[in-house]
Amino acid sequence: MNVKIDNSWRKHIGAEFEKPYFTQLTDFVRQEYSTTACYPPGSLVFNAFNLCPFDAVKVVIIGQDPYHEPGQAQGLSFSVPAGVPFPPSLQNIFKEIQLDLGKPIPQTGDLTRWAEQGVLLLNATLTVRAHQAASHQRHGWEQFTDAAISALSAEREHLVFILWGGYARSKKQLIDRGRHLVLESVHPSPLSANRGGWFSNHHFSLCNAYLREHGEQEIDW
């Protein structure tokens, strides 16, 4: 696995690449990609970091692991390439944006436009075996992405961390609430959202209000 990651991130988490766990992780990922179908494509594994340099991050949305069906994963949490049908969680994200901000449902589920505005769409695990959710968990990715979250918390100010569902909410221990806004709710998956607590959480308007309050351009969701 060739680590092609924006240099701004190397300054802050580059030490992770030299640690034994990352060597083991690299060996595991190379073996997986060489012997079975895995997602996202190798060139997109670090897409979230490359589209959103460290000093440009305004918002962090934490996912669990990539979509595991063909043609969906593109290295950005919750995002799918243009032309791909919206997965159920993404449908509910767009419905909440419509409720919260009055914006129409977009034509594409490609969230690159968010990333380019400073939204780090970070899956805790950056790769997955085809058709097997969570298959690459507990091999080292979580240690790496925890380091990224911790670096942002310690070295930046006035970011918005958006945590949907129990897994993402477990990351709040890494975040200094005195320096940042943390927004939490249930996961947007239909199973969780339909029980209540997702719709009308107003995370998108709350996020933008906080950014404006601290002199930042709001996100065009």
Name each model-derived stretch:
Residues 1-13:
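Generic N-terminal amphipathic, Lys/Arg-enriched alpha-helix
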Residues 15-160, 168-170, 175, 181-184, ...:
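A polyanion-binding, active-site-adjacent surface
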